[in-house]
């Protein structure tokens, strides 16, 4: 949450340490926030769409300057530059491409689906300008961290676990505040955290685990996977979850145990609800996504 002055950094924000100082003196001051584009301000209505786009493209211009400076200096080796622009704008403006989305009613009509098309035209132009800087033996790679689909409905997996008896709350509680504040771990078998992870409350791994590793854990994973796969949204009559994948069946390698016990695969239009992501338990399993972040 801190924007550290790149010219006089109070903390190391580049390697080597003087690189941010060099860039700021050469190109001017620049944003150093980890999440530079303020998507949450737009989500909460503190920032309107037009100034959000202005902010996002201002940051984009700074990253372009750094990229072309690095390309000009680097005669041998790799130059890597990450642009948040495509991610942020699509998260916040994908609703314009989905006429049935619940958040569309609050969206300014004048922005229209043209926002994302304009974004890709701009990025295509950037790729062309980078290619002009490359030599005959240079290789250009363009990569994305994920694709996009509409996020219409949220699924609170923790609420579902509570209703099914896999997650327990403290005496007298029917809901839990974020980060599982009111969860009774001594009688909880499973919990969900993040966008797609479901974890067993495993002995020896969780601080107050009750599920024994081995046969008990494997049987519980199989049961949860079976019950979650095809979970139906009574409002839309659609399957919200296409499959809950057992990590031992889809992952291999030395870091497999770092993954959630089950990976939840959501159907098109569905995602973990905002409350479920941060461990909130409430009375609602399914809900409309009314926020601007809908891609």
Name the predicted role of every residue range:
Residues 44-71, 86, 121, 128:
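A conserved hydrophobic secondary-structure block that centers on an alpha-helix together
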Residues 59-95, 264:
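Active-site regions of oxyanion-processing enzymes, predominantly non-cytosolic
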Residues 1-29, 33-52, 108, 114, ...:
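Secreted, luminal/periplasmic, and some membrane-associated catalytic domains
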Residues 95-114, 283-286:
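A solvent-exposed, charged loop/short amphipathic helix patch at secondary-structure junctions
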Residues 92, 99-101, 161-164, 170, ...:
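Alpha-helix boundary/interfacial micro-motifs
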Residues 283-295:
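Short, cationic low-complexity segments
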